Amino acid sequence: MRHRKAGRHLNRDNAHRKAMFKNLAAALFREEEIRTTVPKAKELRRVAEPLITLAKEDTTANRRLAFARLRDKEMVTKLFEELGPHFKERPGGYMRILRCGFRKGDGAPMALVQLVDREEAIAARRETEEDAEETAEA
């Protein structure tokens, strides 16, 4: 019996599940928006949100904890230098899960997982890219 056992198994063993969520979290931090199944999206929230909370305070110890979970230096750097400061004032709820229909092959319910306030970040990034292009042309 699995009474009072938290979390979803998702038909995978423990190592596969950990690797999958590590990769999903890294993809979410890299792209800031991913498409996956609804159960994976809901479970991803339990993995990714604590990492963003950890990134709000940039210390060596927190970077090591994040690296232990992600195993990707590039994503840890982005997490602590971009996402952490971006969500500094937000007390939680860094992700948005939007249902987006069903997968064609097997009918699995799909979801779009986004980081909240993503539009502002994209607009700011576009402005800096445009400024960089203008200075490069001059």
From Swiss-Prot:
GO CC annotations, alphabetized: cytosolic large ribosomal subunit
Keyword Ribonucleoprotein listed: yes
SUPFAM superfamilies the record matches: Prokaryotic ribosomal protein L17
Molecular function terms from GO: structural constituent of ribosome
Example of a GO biological process term: translation
One Pfam family per UniProt: Ribosomal_L17
Keywords from the named record: Ribonucleoprotein, Ribosomal protein
Quaternary structure (record): Part of the 50S ribosomal subunit. Contacts protein L32.
Family, per entry: Belongs to the bacterial ribosomal protein bL17 family.
Protein name (record): Large ribosomal subunit protein bL17
Organism from which the protein derives: Halorhodospira halophila (strain DSM 244 / SL1) (Ectothiorhodospira halophila (strain DSM 244 / SL1))
Gene name of the record: rplQ
